[in-house]
A protein has these predicted regions:
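Residue-level recognition of short loop/turn positions
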Residues: 10-11, 149, 167, 185, ...
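Glycine-rich hexapeptide-repeat left-handed beta-helix
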Residues: 190-191, 196-294
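Extended, small-residue-rich solenoid/repeat segments and analogous flexible loops
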Residues: 94-175, 179
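Conserved short-loop catalytic and cofactor-binding motifs
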Residues: 23-26, 102, 138, 156, ...
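Short, surface-exposed helix/turn micro-motifs that flank interaction/cofactor sites
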Residues: 36, 151, 169-171, 221, ...
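Terminal amphipathic alpha-helical/low-complexity segments used for targeting or macromolecular assembly
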Residues: 1-132, 279, 285
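Surface-exposed extracellular loop regions of Gram-negative outer-membrane beta-barrel proteins
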Residues: 183-189
Length: 294
């Protein structure tokens, strides 16, 4: 049986501020770390994990594989590399000569790529388990997973694939839709709408907020009325600054990327694609039109 080696990601500036406080492999998608997703996909393809670079196959640490493309590569020993359109090589095999050009697999090069991977992880998930109850008035149109000790209060509406971790409080009267993953010990409160987003553990979005196509790190607190914008007036693709350069995200909808421990003042408005570095904050009524680094 062929073996694979999955190295650590190392420095990943494209995913800052999220990877300033954790490795990329430790970032949760559908409340499971990227590394665990990668390992599960590779093992399901019939490979065995090795502890060092002498393995038959070496995996790009930011690779996200489409299972069908991975199966094609594994089955044909003549393939020596799996690459994608930007030239990144997701997988190499000793002794192989040919290149398999993948169209569905990708590398998580930027923070917004985590949103894409989260959608795919949640769509592929077969079992959604409810380990805690919800109020009888809760409306679910989709698949909902609820962790232990979590309370879902009256008036909550769920649409799409939603995962809520352990010991959370959700509601009353909030709307969660799309592919949204909420980590352990989070609070999503009165009149909050969340769409296609990721909340890491210990985060609070308590009152009158909109969070769309966004990622919030651990122990973030959104002051009442904090709003993320996710759509340009002209409907064009969002661009976001990375290491001093403006990068086309390829996304028509993109909200905010928020690092660990950020606090926003009440009525903060955040432009699309803006990023707030860990432990930064905003004043009440702030308009965030550029990244906040300190």
């Amino acid at each position: 049986m062929a073996t694979f080696y999955l190295p650590d990601a190392g420095e990943t500036p494209g995913c800052h501020p999220l990877t300033l406080t954790r490795s990329l492999g430790d970032f949760p998608l559908a409340n499971v770390t990227l590394r665990r997703h990668q390992q599960a996909t590779l093992l399901a393809a019939g490979l065995t994990e090795a502890s060092g670079p002498d393995a038959d196959l070496t995996v790009h640490p930011a690779a996200w594989f489409a299972p069908a493309e991975l199966a094609t590569f594994v089955a044909d020993a003549s393939y020596g590399t799996m690459s994608i359109a930007d030239g990144a090589v997701l997988l190499t095999r000793k002794g192989g000569q040919r290149d398999l050009r993948a169209t569905q697999s990708f590398a998580i090069a930027y923070a917004w790529d985590l949103l894409r991977a989260n959608v795919e992880a949640m769509t592929a998930r077969k079992h959604y388990v409810q380990e805690s109850g919800a109020h009888a008035s809760v409306y679910v149109d989709g698949r909902l997973q609820v962790g232990k000790g979590t309370k879902i209060l009256p008036g909550v509406v769920i649409e799409g694939d939603v995962i809520i971790g352990d010991h959370c409080k959700v509601g009353p009267n909030c709307y969660i839709r799309g592919s949204t993953a909420i980590g352990d010990k989070c609070h999503v409160g009165q009149a909050v709408e969340i769409k296609n987003s990721i909340l890491l553990p210990g985060t609070n979005v308590g009152h009158l907020s909109y969070l769309g196509d966004s990622i919030l790190g651990e122990k973030v607190n959104f002051g009442a009325g904090t709003i993320t914008s996710n759509l340009r007036h002209d409907g064009g693709m969002h661009r976001s600054p990375v290491a001093g350069n403006m990068v086309d995200t390829g996304r028509r909808k993109l909200g905010a990327i928020i690092g660990d421990g950020v606090h926003t003042g009440i009525h903060t408005s955040i432009y699309p694609g803006r990023k707030l570095w860990p432990e930064t904050s905003t004043l009440p009524g702030a308009i965030v039109d550029k990244d906040i680094l300190s």
